Amino acid sequence: MDVTLRPWVTDDAAALRLAAATSPDLSSQLGDTDLGTIDACEGFIDRQLRRRPPLGQDLAIAVDGRVAGNVGLSNVDRQHDTAWVYYWVAMEFRGRGLATCALATMSVWAFDYWELFRLELGHRLNNPASCAVARGAGFGAEGVERAKLRYGDQRFDVETHARLATDPAPSVRLLPTVAVA
């Protein structure tokens, strides 16, 4: 299995459409955007996933050339050298450790290239798989924010995690990263 991180391209629209159609839990992570057509997916890629420094960066997780997910960095705060990180993996690619490796790789890149000191993320308490990704990538739990997220009429508690540049590196494989600006 050849896994790389690379920038999103408009040609990834079909893979994004398939991921959204077969992974209904992604709708909240993708902002409840309608991704039912190739045109809609192309627009989403251009507006949301082709972000470039200094605003942030999204990278496609590619498996044997196919888009399997995303790992991203946003809300960069240069005064405090912090940022928010996030990830998702399409249903058919879950359970292979892809998100953990991608998050660990993005973290190293954020510390080295962006010269950030603290990375933060959060996951719903009812998402133990996301918690396992965070912990596996070296992010320690810091606390629970009650009723932080709202999807539809339902509110969710969120566990926050952080990783510092001075924290020990996790024992996971880092992924090759292709042509990141």
Where in this protein do the model-derived segments appear?
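A short helix-loop-beta-strand connector motif used in the catalytic cores of GNAT acetyltransferases and
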Residues: 47-60
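Acyl-donor (CoA/ACP) binding surface of acyl/acetyltransferases
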Residues: 1-24, 58-181
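Conserved GNAT-fold acetyl-CoA-binding loop/helix
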Residues: 25-46
